Regions:
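Protein kinase glycine-rich loop
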Residues: 16-22, 27
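Conserved N-lobe loop of protein kinases adjacent to the ATP-binding glycine-rich P-loop
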Residues: 31-38
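AlphaC helix of the eukaryotic protein kinase fold
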Residues: 45-67
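Activation segment of protein kinases
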Residues: 49-53, 146-196, 224
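Hydrophobic/aromatic scaffold residues of ePK-like serine/threonine protein kinase catalytic domains
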Residues: 67, 117-118
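Activation-segment/catalytic-loop signature of the eukaryotic protein kinase fold
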Residues: 79
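Conserved short submotifs of the Hanks-type protein kinase catalytic core
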Residues: 84-98, 102
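C-terminal lobe helix-coil module of Hanks-type protein kinase domains
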Residues: 119, 125-126, 182-288
Length: 371
């Protein structure tokens, strides 16, 4: 639904302006009617709210994001439903841009800034992994960049809508041979539909793709069709970056990425923070004068997608081959779309400190910039 300016949702949030339209619905800037604190409201479209799978994704995003406490993960402050039944999610307001917009504008990200981004994304996801949650859709559009007072980058990881909770019992949300995510950023186990093999190392693969994309301005796996991308992810290796970007990307970075791009999960780093530390150490071997030098990305052979060319797909692979198509396999009663035992944010008691990976102390002490 389109919300007119001035509409008040849940007696608490006054709509200020529309921000944009996403895959799940519309996003608005709003303000709390009492405190006037700015928030962002993500409202699901009426059409998608009628589909059980889409509704389940939205519900999962609410539950997972609210339970994960980390300064580099977007904060959910409330949720509810409109008078006509569309669910909405109230989040902290982020003033900045996503990494996808940054890459579209600048082509590439200088190595030192890429290191900042990788460390913070890894820090955020390490907390999710410690709680048994795998993001499964890490990509530039889900990495938001805030500028701090000292000019550094502060990262927020967003959209846990298709995350996988490893400790949960198997449900109809996760079917055997199901492929979920964005093809260009999928790990081989995701691309092959091996759902039982998807774990924290799958997110590590996606972060390596993100790293490659930032450094080169292009994707390591790209074909003009979905099946072509998936087959490439499963069977092919990307070309090393160092020879093409001599002086900008050291060979040690290639070595780190090559390890993460192993088709075997056990050959990757044991944790996503271990990958980030190895990447930072490898980046430190770059020549200081040229490591931060920006420049246009070389144009790859063949067309690669821009902002509108990256798509997220949710499709099932048939036993005899790949077949794309939306899955709506979850039965949910629409009377109450959030769990009965899951309190609303305005009634919740302060949560205890989240369990975090032991090597995450540096970024847990960091806090986002004042806005």
């Amino acid at each position: 639904m389109d919300l007119p300016i001035g509409t008040v949702l849940g007696d608490n949030y006054e709509i200020i302006r529309p921000i944009g339209i996403g895959g799940m619905g519309s996003i608005y800037e709003a303000a709390h009617v009492t405190t006037r604190k700015r928030v962002a409201i993500k409202m699901m479209s009426k059409e998608l709210a009628a589909h059980p799978e889409a509704l389940a994704r939205f519900r999962r995003e609410v539950k997972v994001t609210t339970e994960l406490a980390h300064p580099n993960i977007i904060e959910v402050v409330d949720f509810g439903a409109s008078p006509t039944g569309e669910p909405y999610l109230v989040m902290e307001y982020l003033d900045g841009e996503d990494l996808e917009a940054r890459l579209e504008r600048d082509g590439r990200v200088p190595l030192p800034i890429a290191v900042q981004i990788i460390k913070q994304v890894a820090s955020a996801l390490s907390v999710a992994h410690a709680e048994g949650v795998v993001h499964r859709d890490l990509k530039p559009g889900n990495v938001f960049l805030l500028r701090t007072d000292d000019g550094s980058i502060f990262v927020k990881v967003v959209d846990f809508g298709i995350s996988k909770v490893l400790r949960a019992a198997t449900t109809k949300l996760t079917m055997a041979r199901a492929v979920v995510g964005t093809p260009e950023f999928m790990s081989p186990e995701q691309a092959a539909g091996r759902v039982d093999q998807i774990d924290h190392r799958s997110d590590q693969w996606a972060l390596a793709v993100l790293s490659w994309h930032m450094l080169s301005g292009r994707l390591p796996f790209w074909k003009p069709d979905v099946n072509g991308i998936l087959n490439q992810v499963i069977a092919e290796d990307p070309t090393p970056l160092a020879p093409e970007f001599a002086g900008l990307i050291p060979r040690e970075v290639d070595k780190v990425l090559r390890r993460v791009f192993s088709k075997k999960r056990e050959d990757r780093f044991p944790t996503i923070n271990a990958f980030a530390r190895a990447f930072e150490a490898a980046a430190a071997t770059a020549a200081p004068a040229r490591a931060a030098a920006p420049g246009p990305a070389p144009r790859p052979s063949g067309r690669q997608p821009g902002r509108k060319g990256l798509w997220t797909v949710l499709f099932a692979i048939a036993l005899i081959g790949a077949a794309a198509g939306w899955m709506y396999r979850v039965e949910i009663t629409s009377a109450s779309w959030w769990p009965d035992d899951f309190p609303r944010a305005d009634r919740a008691q302060p949560a205890g400190e989240a369990k975090v990976a032991p090597d995450d102390s540096e970024h847990r002490r960091r806090r986002p910039p004042r806005r």
